[in-house]
Regions:
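Structural signal for beta-propeller blades
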Residues: 24-26, 66-68, 106-107, 124, ...
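Blade-level signature of beta-propeller repeat domains, shared across WD40, Kelch, NHL, RCC1
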Residues: 147-177
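Residue position within the beta-strands of beta-propeller blades
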Residues: 1, 60, 99-100, 160-161
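Loop/turn-rich, solvent-exposed surfaces of beta-rich toroidal or solenoidal domains
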Residues: 52, 84-142
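Beta-propeller blade signature
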Residues: 17-31, 117-130
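Short, conserved, GDST-rich strand-edge loop motifs in beta-rich repeat architectures
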Residues: 1-21, 100-119, 170
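Short loop/turn segments that connect beta-strands within beta-propeller blades
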Residues: 29-33, 72-76, 128-132, 174-175
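Beta-rich, blade/repeat-based domains predominating
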Residues: 20-25, 35-57, 65-66, 81-96, ...
Length: 177
């Protein structure tokens, strides 16, 4: 994904928390080694993306847009929207999309700038691949791990990576904090 132009300032980023204007889009690498901007995916800080190869669909998380959108790559139309604060990364596994969301404000994140381990709440949300409707939500208070950035389900566990700590964590898919 192309989140924003290289000359995008911190002031513009903070303004976009409220304005939610288009800052970037998903980019496709073609067979001719060229990049094609998918303008129909334009949104506020497109971040995590995942390709559902079986259905030829693309999921794009809009970090400051507070939503994830499922696009049909053939028709270039939206098939579903999941609205939730600050989606980060997305994984497709087991016939579902797994979207990690930051369940805290940008102001709370800014207070973590100097700390090694920033403990703020987040969730990993299991979504339908047909329309991004919520199937199940796993919520974490992040007491000792750091802010979750990605959740990968595997063998009854949810493996969680963090963007503001030096840890990964394993959570039981049958329990939530």
């Amino acid at each position: 994904s192309h989140m924003f132009d290289s000359d995008f300032s911190m002031i513009s980023a903070l303004w976009n928390v409220f304005a939610k204007s288009d800052t970037g889009m998903a980019v496709k690498w073609t067979q001719y080694n060229k990049f094609e901007e998918l303008m129909y995916t334009a949104g506020s800080f497109p971040n995590g993306i995942a390709l559902d190869q079986k259905n030829n669909n693309l999921i794009v998380n809009y970090n400051l847009g507070d939503k994830s959108i499922l696009f049909d790559l053939n028709s270039k139309q939206s098939l579903g929207i999941y609205e939730h604060n600050s989606p980060d990364n997305v994984v497709i596994k087991g016939g579902f999309a797994w979207v990690t969301n930051h369940d805290h404000s940008v102001a709370e994140s800014l207070r973590c700038a100097e700390t090694v381990n920033c403990t703020l709440p987040f969730s990993v949300n299991k979504l339908s691949l047909s329309d991004l409707s919520l199937v199940e939500s796993y919520k974490f208070k992040s007491k000792n791990m750091g802010i979750g950035t990605v959740g990968l389900p595997h063998d009854g566990s949810l493996w969680i990576g963090s963007y503001h700590s030096d840890r990964i964590a394993e959570g039981n898919l049958f329990l939530s904090e």
